[in-house]
Amino acid sequence: MRQFTVNCRTLASPWGNEDTQTLIDILAQYDVKTTFFVVGDWAEKYPESVKALHDAGHEVMSHSNHHDHYNSLSTQQIIDDVTASNQRISASTGVTPTLIRCPYGEYDDHVIAAIRSMGMEPIQWDVDSLDWKDYDAETICERVTSKVQPGSIVLFHNAALHTPEALPTILSCLINDGYTVVPISQLILDAPYTIDHTGRQFPAEHAG
C-alpha cells in the first residue's frame, strides 16, 4: 500500500495558532488523519488548539517542552523535558504522547536511549516542505510531490505563510496518485528495524 504521513510541527514562538483550525478543516475535507508534534510551551499557550487537533482525530505528539538542543542535555534533563511536554499535552488531550520529534531534528545515541527509556520512539522525516522559508504554494507543492515515496514522512509547520494554500493541491495530487495519508503510528515498525540517514525504517532482516 502506498502510504505516507503529513507531519506538522507546532511551536510557541514565533509560530502562532492562527491557521490551526484552517489546517484541521483542510485535512477533514480530504478525510485525512495525521500527526502533529507539539512543543509544550505551545500546548500551554494554546490548549484549545491542542484539544481541537485531538478531537478532530489527529495524533498529538511531543516536540519537546521548550525546543532546546537535546544533544547538549544530559539523559535526565531530556527525560525531565519530555515528561513536562507530555504532561502539558495530555492535560488537553487526555492521552500521553508515545512519539517525539526532537528539536531541530537533532539526535544522537544518548538522546535516543533517553527517549526509549521512557517507552517512546523518536521520529524524523524524509521530505521537508521547507514551508517555513515562505516559498510560494507552487514551489512547496512541487518540492513535496516530487520527493514523496511510499512510507514518507513529510514535514510541514503550522503558521507557515503558504501551507494552507499548498496543502489541498498536495493532498489531491498524491491521493489521486494512489497514496493514503495515515498518522505516523500506523507507519512505524514495531519489529526489529534499522534506520537510514533519512530516518526511514527498514525491517532488520533487510539490513545491509
Regions found by a protein language model. Name each.
Residues 206-208:
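Short, solvent-exposed mixed-charge patches
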Residues 1-73, 77, 81-91, 95, ...:
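Active-site beta->alpha N-cap acidic-glycine motif
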Residues 22, 44-45, 65-203:
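Catalytic domains of cell-wall/extracellular-matrix polysaccharide-remodeling enzymes
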